């Protein structure tokens, strides 16, 4: 964007914080495409349904990549057991491939793994009938079957972060899938009631919920799921408010 000399002179007279805001706004509006560094690791979508897509990341052709400024040799020997990344619902898949030198999927591919990622998509109000059972008992078996079909391998390693870890654990327990070779669980609550001070809060809420259920018969499961739909921007605001 070309700025007239008069406008440029006026901007220079503004306080420094205001100039920063204008510069950032200019970048976001007119240079957004140039600023995006995420999702540069090549992948192909090998399967999709109405909402969810399955990504397969392609082998790296270079002999060496940079990881946070440090050179790393690319392993050309592929591990036999594919790695399936199971994300939480409330994140953008860009987080796994954020920068060329800070990319989890690129790092795993460079280490010789066949990397797959289940992209949950962006649920809308027409998906409010989906529940935990939908993801654990329907989507997980469906998409892991496609990974096995594409890779030709029965054994899989699952990498679950946050709610993705819950999906991974529930799937493994409920299906008794003996071909899950490894489980990597990050930031996933296993027993929320035992989580220190936060766990005490959960225990108090549970006691009150039991009292309400006992005395009124009310259960939150009986509410219309559309009333509980949370838009993505609300999740963003909530997480930012917890940032110190």
Question: What is each model feature region?
Answer:
Residues 1-39, 75-76:
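N-terminal targeting or regulatory segments adjacent to alpha/beta-hydrolase or S9 domains
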Residues 2-17, 149, 153, 167-244:
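Alpha/beta-hydrolase-fold enzymes
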Residues 39, 45-124:
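Short, surface-exposed "cap/lid" segments of acyl-processing enzymes
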Residues 82, 156, 181:
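Conserved acidic residues
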Residues 100-103, 134, 201-202:
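Glycine-rich, phosphate-binding/catalytic loops in enzymes
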Residues 127-129, 196:
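Conserved catalytic-core motifs of eukaryotic protein kinase domains, centered on the activation segment
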Residues 130-150:
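Alpha/beta-hydrolase active-site loop
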Residues 159-168:
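Gly/Ala-rich beta-loop-alpha elbow adjacent to hydrolase catalytic centers
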